[in-house]
Amino acid sequence: MTSSLKIWGILLALLCILCRLCVYSNNIYWREFIKLHYLSPSREFKEYKCDVLMREKEALKGKSFHMFIYSLWFKIQRACINEKGSDRYRNAYVWAPGALKVLECHWEKYNNRYTESRSFSYIEFHCGVDGYVDNIEDLRIIEPISN
């Protein structure tokens, strides 16, 4: 009897640990997306430079192309919320409701630096199974932004 109680106690403890992991890791893809693609409006858009950004972010070192989004974070997060605001799109492709500023970085191997292209663009996001943006799928440039 006591051994079966110990087993049930261990199983209950493991279940609690699993539930805790599910709750705390729910938005892990969203946090990773923001860490890699988000540019805060606390600085001017023109102040962001590809060479600096690509060097500062460890996960981007060595990449030949990357895209950054300059916007308030909740505008990006809102892309995965349905029109009524009552539910999230899950495992779906969704176009952001308005144009966002985008900084694209392209590696020039002959000049050994990144070139920049800035634009107002419509962005298609992928909403993950947790209902948060986890990837950029497509881009439609509306208007280039000159430096």
UniProtKB/Swiss-Prot annotation:
Entry-linked InterPro entries: EDDM3A/EDDM3B (IPR042402), RNaseA-like_dom_sf (IPR036816), RNaseA_domain (IPR023412)
GO biological process, one term: sperm displacement
Any one Gene Ontology cellular component term annotated for this protein: extracellular space
Signal peptide range: 1-25
Tissue-specific expression: Epididymis, with predominant expression in the corpus region. Moderately expressed in the vas deferens; only low levels are detectable in the caput and cauda regions.
Subcellular location: Secreted
Keywords from the UniProt entry: Secreted, Signal
Pfam families recorded: RnaseA
Domain of life where this protein originates: Eukaryota
Described function: Possible function in sperm maturation.
Name the UniProt record assigns to this protein: Epididymal secretory protein E3-alpha
Organism: Homo sapiens (Human)
